[in-house]
Amino acid sequence: MSKNSVKDKAKSATANKTIALNKRARHEYHIEERFEAGLALQGWEVKSIRAGRGNIIDAYAYVKQGEIFLIGAQITPLIQASTHVVANDRRERKLLLHRSEIDKLVGKVERDGYTIVPTAMYWSKNKIKLEVALAKGKQTHDKRDAAKDRDWAIEKQRVMRRGNRDA
């Protein structure tokens, strides 16, 4: 086995770890802090996620009786899923976090007007993990400013490339 094939395998292994991304979260929220949380899933949900049927774009988390639950995440059941289990693709799922992390999130959400938003779903040691972020909503003008900054960064790169070609 050559060195290149080992590098290619490593790259493909890291690329396969991401199940779903929530790009909308970065656009609509100021992300303050990120946490890694486990998910309490049923067997058919894990099978569906392995088949690439997970979606977290419209999802958010909320606090209920000192625990944090994910709602709005869609895990579409497989066609060959078992019929004796009623598959609800948008059911609320419990997030598994340490008590200190839960307390920190609860304090910020209840007092400071933050929200808990999932940003990514990925594999970690054969377990499905969810990256949740403590975030504050952006105003419309904040979104426009972010778009301007992004456009300016792209334009700067173009100018720099043109300048390097001429030299």
Curated annotation (Swiss-Prot):
- Recorded GO MF terms: RNA binding
Q: Name one Pfam family in it.
A: SmpB
**Taxonomic superkingdom:** Bacteria
Q: Where in the cell is it found?
A: Cytoplasm
UniProtKB keywords: Cytoplasm, RNA-binding
Q: Could you mention a single GO BP entry for this protein?
A: trans-translation
Note whether Transferase occurs among the keywords: no
Q: Which residues form the signal peptide?
A: none
| GO cellular component terms, A-Z | cytosol
Q: What does this protein do?
A: Required for rescue of stalled ribosomes mediated by trans-translation. Binds to transfer-messenger RNA (tmRNA), required for stable association of tmRNA with ribosomes. tmRNA and SmpB together mimic tRNA shape, replacing the anticodon stem-loop with SmpB. tmRNA is encoded by the ssrA gene; the 2 termini fold to resemble tRNA(Ala) and it encodes a 'tag peptide', a short internal open reading frame. During trans-translation Ala-aminoacylated tmRNA acts like a tRNA, entering the A-site of stalled ribosomes, displacing the stalled mRNA.
What family does this chain come from, according to its entry?
Belongs to the SmpB family.
Record protein name field: SsrA-binding protein
Taxonomic lineage is:
Bacteria, Pseudomonadati, Pseudomonadota, Gammaproteobacteria, Lysobacterales
